[in-house]
Amino acid sequence: MAGYPKIIHTEEGMRDGLQIEDRDIPVAAKIRLLNALSLTGLQEINVGSFVSPKYTPQMACVDELISGFEPQPGVKYTYTALNDKGVERAKAYSPPLSPRVSELSTRVDMCDAFAQRNTNRTQAQQIAVWPKTIARAVEKGVKEGGMSISNVWGSNWIGQVPFEQHMLMFDRMYRMWEDAGIPVTKVGMADATGWNMPHEVERTLVGLKERYPTIKDFNLHLHNARGVALASIYAALKVLDGSDTLRLQTSIGGMAGCPYCGMGRAAMMIATEDLMHMLQEMGIHTGVDLYKLIECVWLAEEVVGHQLFGFTSKAGPRPHYDKLYAMDMPHIETLEQAKHFILGKKAYEGAHSPWNEPITSWQRPEAPGYKEKLAKQGEKPESIPGVQPKLVAR
């Protein structure tokens, strides 16, 4: 089937992002950020983790956060819990939190060292749980199974994981589900240490689709430590098609990280605004107001006290129609001045302007005789830069 896969996106700024930031950020500031995110058109937001503050002190206020924010209709609010105790805590806040869907999946980390650092279990202990997971699925009459691998392509402790090695691990899980009479329909790939590369992600997805035709649901949790995660998502969009579902997690401004991966905040995620900009420019509907989302990034920078890592929040989206730049605007040199795409002229007030006369051009849609001149050249207006259909209205 042609076309792009169905995309299900989860915003991780409140969870993966804030878990690596200052533990003393006031809860009121977090509530303000969550309220703003809720008004951007994002379909799903992870609000935080129900975990021990001993291990993740940044999440100590998650109960107060959920009690204090203003949920919006149409937004799915999710959470992270690593054990039954966390799940039970979260039940007290449903709604607004969406009930957790009970899905049984076999999981393993390709890096034994990271498994111990992150989950306090060895890889062998993770594998030993598989038969119990599948037996529970059989007992419950589950019709579909899932499998997931972390550090699929490598880690900072063992280096690169060859394609054949992680595919063999997928195959071991798949065969166990198959022997139990349960087809695997979902697969997850996590990359906490940022080892993804577009050509390797492509090869893995092609391999999965060729070997396991029952799988139609793919989850990619990619970190952007080496700056190529967005390209890896693009590779996934080209491999998968309209019969598939692609689940993605990103974070506003790219803020994210893991204290156990050895890189801290440098293990950032794809910036949500960069992903949404790319999808919209590819003609993929997101429902997100990109300008409101960028204002959330600026707010997040105030909350955490430092500049974040995305690009679209600094340069702005590719401008169309009424968003085209003023041709005689002055010299723009700083990041603050570049915010004129939202703030207008006040962003560059007082900047140096060398132009003696106003700059005009026939190539602007507002120019007299613009359409007629295009027609003489045999071109259609929508084929010229600056006159493409606007994808998101402000």
For the regions a protein language model found, what residue spans apply to each?
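Catalytic cores and adjacent flexible loops of soluble metabolic enzymes
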Residues: 1-394
